[in-house]
Curated annotation (Swiss-Prot):
A Gene Ontology term for the protein's cellular component: ribonucleoprotein complex
PANTHER family, per the entry: MITOCHONDRIAL RIBOSOMAL PROTEIN L24
Organism classification: Bacteria, Pseudomonadati, Chlorobiota, Chlorobiia, Chlorobiales
Any single GO BP term: translation
The UniProt record lists the keyword Ribosomal protein: yes
Gene name of the encoded protein: rplX
Record note on quaternary structure: Part of the 50S ribosomal subunit.
Name under which the protein is recorded: Large ribosomal subunit protein uL24
Organism whose genome encodes this protein: Chlorobaculum parvum (strain DSM 263 / NCIMB 8327)
Pfam families named in the record: KOW (PF00467), ribosomal_L24 (PF17136)
Amino acid sequence: MKTGIKKIKLHVKKNDDVVVIAGNDKGKSGKVLKVFPQKGRVIVEGVNIRKRHMRPTQTSPQGSIIEREFPIHASNVKKS
């Protein structure tokens, strides 16, 4: 029995220009920043932005809230 995760061949790769065709960000376009072939997901610039709460550290004792892109499923994007 095999163990591990199977890579999925995706139709997009890093630096491709894509348009979101499904979900809350439908109609938005951007550049692919990162691809996760094992999960079948991609990170698109300016799409699926969420707030991330950062703990206080020595460099930033106040802590912070940053906004960044999170992955979306590759089937929800198409090349433009």
